[in-house]
């Protein structure tokens, strides 16, 4: 009942939700190869949202990135397992990149689906060893750097913002570097990405910091003793103990610290947009853009929100689906980021106007707005060229809408009515007077809604 109420409150999310259901169905169709089948089943278990975007990648990239993700999730499982003593964990993190070449290596650690990933790790190894040498080298190199970085931070706290940036570089910035190398190595992406490691690093930090901000309560309540990544340089300005933010009596300081953390994460947004503006493969673009827009949406939701210290804060499924289906091009991504930035600016000038960091928050948001506005202006000429092309996306969307409307007329047996309204003498031919039945009517309505929604996103029928 709750989900139905959500849909009724946000009817514009219905079509994206239906599209996401279709995408979700296809993620469950795994390859027949036992090794690849295991990898894609595990991918669905450890990250449904990531499974959806990986399945949309070009074939050249799909399997290497799936394996890349699982290798790094396994490494992350070792890092996160607080039951592993450091004398075992540290050498393992530093040597983990070598385990991917050992067909027999596995271990028991982690929790939930990660237990199966670690126990059946040879299945991942088998697929990895079948990859071309180029992807294998990239995965090995990034795993080596990440493992060494994680080992560096196991015995020490994240004290400064510089420490925070460095840890997030190891945990996620290196992922961006590896993805760029895989994409360029496949021949699908712009070689200039290899010269823009700073931008790919910002992509990773934007995602990682969003997760760290959002997961405060889950992380602080972890047993045994939790590892926290909020830098003391920030939280030390608002409390003597990071755990104090769980106490409702400390809500004011907690929210101020939260806003400070969100503001820090926002500095990566403009650079993430600059990275994505360099991409040329549409499927790889979607793969990169969807997590970034979800991260910005989550940061916006967390900003000035005391619920972060009380429970789960996440985007509605319909809202997530709408975001995932709207960012199909750079102009669409600019518009979405600009809308979110505008919303946050309004809140900074309203509900959060007394926040001690509001001036810096506004500065970061204005930087994002500037990149979006500049990008949209520069895309006007290319959009006009695209509109003049007979087979542009706009043309196809409108064509599908017209065909869908025709299908609706036929499926609902409306042709006799149109025949009479057109003042055509005589009855319509028998072939035009039969209804196709409920299944066809449902499909026809879905086609019209989907095509109509895409036409609306692209600026209407004009």
From Swiss-Prot:
It holds the Pfam family SQS_PSY. Mg(2+) binds at residues 76, 79-80. Converts farnesyl diphosphate (FPP) into squalene, a precursor for sterol biosynthesis in eukaryotes. This is Squalene synthase LSS. Coiled coil: none annotated. The keyword Cytoplasm does not apply. GO terms for cellular component: endoplasmic reticulum membrane. Keywords: Magnesium, Membrane, Metal-binding, NAD, NADP, Transferase, Transmembrane, Transmembrane helix. The gene is LSS. SUPFAM superfamilies: Terpenoid synthases (SSF48576). The keyword Lipid metabolism does not apply. The chain crosses the membrane at residues 399-419, 436-456.
